[in-house]
Design a protein with these regions (language model features):
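Acidic, surface-exposed loops and disordered segments
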Residues: 1-191
Length: 191
C-alpha cells in the first residue's frame, strides 16, 4: 500500500474485535511514541499502557465516544470495546511541553498500530480526574488524551463534504463516512 492509501485508511475506529493486541505490537506502538520528533528534543511526554482486561474495563466508562452520533450509534457495545488504551501525559516539570509534540507522538502511535491492522481512536472527551486517579497519575503530569486501540470491526471512508458539514455519520453498513473539505478550500495559494 502506498503512503497516501495508508493515510486514507488510517482513520478513527470506534468498534473493535475482542482479540488482544499482541504484546510485540503494543511494544512497537510505544516505541513509535518514544521516537517521535519533538521540539528541541525535549521529550516531555510520558505514557501509561493499559492492557489488562480488568483495567481496560475500568477505563471504558471514563471515555466518551463519537460526539456527533447518538449514544446508541456511537458508543461501542460491550462486545465492541477497545482492548488496549494508552494514556498520553505531558510532564509539566520539564520545559517545553506543547501540543505539537503531543500530536506528533499520537500520529506515530496510530500509524504504527495501523501498519499492523490495529485501529485507533484518539480521545479528548475523557474524565481526566477519574482517569488520573485510576492510573495513579499525579504531580506534574497533565493528562492530555487517551488512545483506544483494537482490531476494527467496521470501515471508515472519506467522503466529499456537503454544504460545509463536518459531521461524520454511519452508512447502512454501520461504517463511518468522514467528510473532508476539498483541496480548493484548504490550499489558500501556491506561490
Amino acid at each position: 500500500m502506498d503512503i497516501m492509501e495508508f493515510l486514507k485508511t488510517r482513520r478513527t475506529y470506534r468498534r473493535f474485535e475482542q482479540k488482544p493486541v499482541e504484546p510485540a505490537i503494543a511494544r512497537e506502538i510505544m516505541e513509535a511514541a518514544r521516537i517521535a520528533s519533538c521540539g528541541a528534543n525535549r521529550q516531555t511526554l510520558k505514557y501509561v499502557l493499559v492492557q489488562s482486561p480488568e483495567m481496560v474495563a475500568k477505563m471504558q466508562p471514563l471515555v466518551h465516544w463519537a460526539a456527533y452520533l447518538p449514544p446508541e450509534q456511537g458508543q461501542p457495545k460491550p462486545d465492541e470495546t477497545p482492548v488496549l488504551f494508552v494514556a498520553v501525559c505531558q510532564d509539566e516539570s520539564l520545559p517545553g511541553c506543547n501540543d505539537t509534540d503531543t500530536g506528533l507522538a499520537l500520529a506515530n502511535m496510530t500509524d504504527a498500530a495501523w501498519a499492523h491492522g490495529v485501529g485507533s481512536c484518539i480521545m479528548g472527551a475523557i474524565d481526566r480526574p477519574a482517569i488520573k486517579e485510576l492510573l495513579g497519575l499525579g504531580g506534574n503530569l497533565r493528562l492530555h488524551s487517551v488512545v483506544a486501540f483494537g482490531y476494527p470491526t467496521h470501515k471508515s471512508h472519506l467522503v466529499a463534504m456537503q454544504n460545509g458539514n463536518v459531521k461524520y455519520y454511519l452508512d447502512d453498513a454501520r461504517d463511518y463516512c468522514v467528510p473532508k473539505r476539498p483541496m480548493e478550500e484548504i490550499l489558500l495559494k501556491t506561490l
